[in-house]
């Protein structure tokens, strides 16, 4: 089984690459960073360091790499031949790679290669694969689109793993937390073997899982950080263990859990376990994550469909408590940083 993965950064190598490697895929990483690409070409293995109570190191092999700027023909050939294409490049970059993917799919059509293919984005966005499909189709004729619709799937997915900011002498070494979650829409998958990726959760409806992550991990992370920042705490792990911070951010998670249970039918015990696991992740002292980094872009985080305002609105509509969420928003307004443009705009 062959995989082409756009993005040889920490998420690509330390999350998606790990799960695909465990599942027996040969991975070709695609990136524009010459140092990373050249190292991946030169070496047979790289290391993932899992930051848990006991540090574990995993060696990955069975990979190669392509430079997206310099190896176009090899890239297009690979796109036309592999069974799985994945991405972890950031939502803003998807339209940029869409033309390259389209060129590879044109070659697939030209060769009448009816081998099935799935293209799955692993980005922090809703309906990322559908978005990429729309961008790719801008570069295809109606006949080519018809062929792609028949033989290429674009299942949406949701991903969750904390990969802290890091720098190492070994450019390929990547440190990650132990927890990871990759959820994929089952009904849009074309290739049967892509239904058997290790540790992936396959579902019919992705929306409940996207909102569970958004309203628990993202809302909780941000709430903890804004309160901790107000109290002068610098690290997420320290904030997660501070009594005053815990009181308020756990109250927020209890409100979002109640909303998720009522809206999507999540089991109460299941939500409590997910909530407690999330809190434990934030407490991990081996993940060195600065509060100031999480607090950036406060205006975006106060967006209508974002991690605070959306659960506040929906809790109100369903007659549920949202007082802890409203209190959390007041802490956002106390964040001051001359280095953050949105923080300055809030003053």
Describe these PLM feature segments.
Residues 1-6, 10-347:
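Substrate/ligand-engaging "lid" and interaction regions
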């Amino acid at each position: 089984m062959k995989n082409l993965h756009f993005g040889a950064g920490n998420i690509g190598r330390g999350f998606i690459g790990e799960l695909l490697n465990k599942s027996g895929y040969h991975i070709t990483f695609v990136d524009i960073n010459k140092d990373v690409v050249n190292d991946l070409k030169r070496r047979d293995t790289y290391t993932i360091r899992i930051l848990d109570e006991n540090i574990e190191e995993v060696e990955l092999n069975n990979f190669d790499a392509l430079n997206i700027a310099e190896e176009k023909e090899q890239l297009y050939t690979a796109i036309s031949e592999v069974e799985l294409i994945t991405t972890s490049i950031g939502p803003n970059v998807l339209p940029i790679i869409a033309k390259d993917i389209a060129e590879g799919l044109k070659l697939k059509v030209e060769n009448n290669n009816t081998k099935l293919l799935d293209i799955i984005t692993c980005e922090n966005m809703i309906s990322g694969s559908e978005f990429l499909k729309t961008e790719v189709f801008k570069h295809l004729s109606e006949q080519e689109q018809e062929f792609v619709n028949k033989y290429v799937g674009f299942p949406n997915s949701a991903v969750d793993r904390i990969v802290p900011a890091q720098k190492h002498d070994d450019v390929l070494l990547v440190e990650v937390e132990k927890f990871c979650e990759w959820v994929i829409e089952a009904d849009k998958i074309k290739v049967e073997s892509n239904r058997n990726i290790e540790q992936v959760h396959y579902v019919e409806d992705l929306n409940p899982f996207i909102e569970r992550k958004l309203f628990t991990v993202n809302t909780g992370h941000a709430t903890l950080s804004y309160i901790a920042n107000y109290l002068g705490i610098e690290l997420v792990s320290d904030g997660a263990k501070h009594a005053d911070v815990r009181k308020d951010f756990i109250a927020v998670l209890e409100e979002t859990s109640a909303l998720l249970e009522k809206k999507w039918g999540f089991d109460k015990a299941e939500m409590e376990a997910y909530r407690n696991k999330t809190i434990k992740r934030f407490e991990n002292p081996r993940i060195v994550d600065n509060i100031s980094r999480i607090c950036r872009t406060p205006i975006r985080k106060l967006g209508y469909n974002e991690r605070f305002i959306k659960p506040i609105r929906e809790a109100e509509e369903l007659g549920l408590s949202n007082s802890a969420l409203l209190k959390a928003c007041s802490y956002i307004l106390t964040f001051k940083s001359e280095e953050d443009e949105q923080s300055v705009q809030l003053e």
